[in-house]
């Protein structure tokens, strides 16, 4: 199956087992992201993705912090779709627009904690020496 054969579903066009999952996501974030809309073809895949998303939300990082990490990773890996999607989510979570823009273009945000998280995420993606970013992250609280 080629990429062009994947359908991005709506809450109405998705298989029945995916409809409620998509509706719940739409209720949470205000829209159905294309990634989830495409995953909806397989209710098991969509359910697993949403379960992982939910589990990630149970950690000690705030939604803004998680999205800053996601933007930094997406920027490093060159995933323009992911940069756009996570920027939207970050702003919806209340991230400062200046911080989102800084991370999108590979700069550090002014907030010390967000800076430490972005630097750490970039270092991990680059497989660089993570010692200095880890110390900075620990020092930021």
Describe each region flagged by the PLM.
Residues 1-141:
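Hydrophobic alpha-helical segments
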